[in-house]
Amino acid sequence: MKVVLKLRADGAGMAIFALPLTDTEHLFVKHLAVGYHYPVLSNIEFSIKGGQKVVITGFNGIGKSTLLITLIGEIPSMQGRFKFSDQVTIGYFEQDLEWQEPELTPIQIVANAYPDMVTKDVRKHLARCGISSKHAMQAIGTLSGGEQAKVKMCLLTLTPCNFLIMDEPTNHLDVQAKEALKTALSTFAGTVLLVSHEEAFYRDWAQRVINIEKK
């Protein structure tokens, strides 16, 4: 199943829309070890049902980001196994603000990613994610971390998915943007796996918290 997300940041607030999902198991993790040259985390076990909202916590450097990039297939696991349901389509938000071409504007970045989209719609989607007309025409590398994060969020909302994997999405956001994202995730009908160090951000809507330090 594929679900198209739309993010709105207007008078009604930011929202993510998705079709309802079954409550079958969407992710199964068993005896998983992750790392590069040696395991930084090992014997990780958990499962997530469709529609669940799960947060992973732990001290900085323990390997939370490494776990996520293993799950999305960027690096191989070192031991154990994991499996996503066949109906899962992943949308991934990484915390690093790195751009292959930092001289491009947000309009150009979105247009390059979605060449069939007309400029009017590109501007509309950026505006819905809180990007002003002025910032939409500036080089992405000159924008603040918060504005860059909003552009990444815009790209994510245009990606068909029903399972959001997010690595510290609030790192560069201001209070207003955090509140908007919190509302969006709490009302999202799909599955969420979030790495976060901000309990105030997730405690009102997360259904499970996995402290990776205790694994």
Name every feature range the model reports, one short phrase each:
Residues L19-K215:
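ABC ATP-binding cassette signature C-motif
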Residues K2-H26:
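ABC-family P-loop ATPase nucleotide-binding domain
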